[in-house]
Amino acid sequence: MIFATLEHILTHICFSIILIVITIHLITLLVHEIGLYNLSEKGMIATFFCITGLLVSRWIYSGHFPLSDLYESLIFLSWSFAIIHMVPKIRNHPNSLSTITAPSTIFTQGFTTSGLLTKMHQSTILVPALQSKWLMMHVSMMLLSYAALLCGSLLSIALLVITFRKNIDILGKSNHLFIGSFSFGKTQYLNEKRSLLHLQKASFLSFRNYHRYQLTHRLDYWSYRVISLGFTFLTIGILSGAVWANEAWGSYWNWDPKETWAFITWTIFAIYSHTRTNKSLQGANSAIVASMGFLIIWICYFGVNLLGIGLHSYGSFTLTSN
């Protein structure tokens, strides 16, 4: 009872901290202040420890590792986002992932706390299929992989947006030059008059292009490494799940909806990893594959639960709300 009360308190504390961090993030969009950024980072650290305490207290009073239903898996997913957010800070690197990981942690935990029915927050007795030592290994690896792959996919989407905008800018400049070539007589004087202004702008434009190149390179660098980490977790999760399935159901693979979409997810990111071996396919081309993976992950994790069918139906909305 004490730990159940502690979980309830930590849930509300965590949600309150999340609201504060969201407010700070919105302010930083308007005001670039280092102090506000540091405050939001401290808020994320506090959120991480609150979620950790929440998971531990639920583990103690429920008597099993808290990964048995949708509510618990969402808490663990937000904790996984927070872990990824903390990695650059632990290694004393600039936190290039905070733009993705912080909102992901905030919105996932916020939805878990306020978006699900209160009945879904209650701990239930494990179904027989989940009463195994493989629960912690398989489900934790899968959720860590989802968190890493979602973050990497979002970085790839950001890369595509920046690249797409760059292509539009180049196209607009090309059209301007094309039109100008047909009105040389009228524009010759204006071009001479504007040449000095163009020279003054040249340094600024080259700096902006260099900054954009650095940004896209950084996005490509981090998306590849985060997705590679997630792909490793996904592979371990699928293999451990196959061993567990053989123990529980007598077969390594049964092609139920969850397993099928897990295989599709693995295939998509295997293709992504293959594109990274070819330099001509790196950058925007591989980012397109990763962006497709973003939707596939949500179908695998969340969409299949809406069906409530198959061997993995114990994590569906229907069963957890009864």
From Swiss-Prot:
Q: Does the keyword Chloroplast apply?
A: yes
Q: Where in the cell is it found?
A: Plastid, Chloroplast thylakoid membrane
A GO term (biological process) for this protein?
cytochrome complex assembly
* UniProt keywords, alphabetically: Chloroplast, Cytochrome c-type biogenesis, Membrane, Plastid, Thylakoid, Transmembrane, Transmembrane helix
Q: Which HAMAP family match?
A: CytC_CcsA (MF_01391)
Indicate the family of this protein.
Belongs to the CcmF/CycK/Ccl1/NrfE/CcsA family.
Spell out the subunit comment: May interact with Ccs1.
Q: Could you identify this protein by its name?
A: Cytochrome c biogenesis protein CcsA
UniProt gene name: ccsA
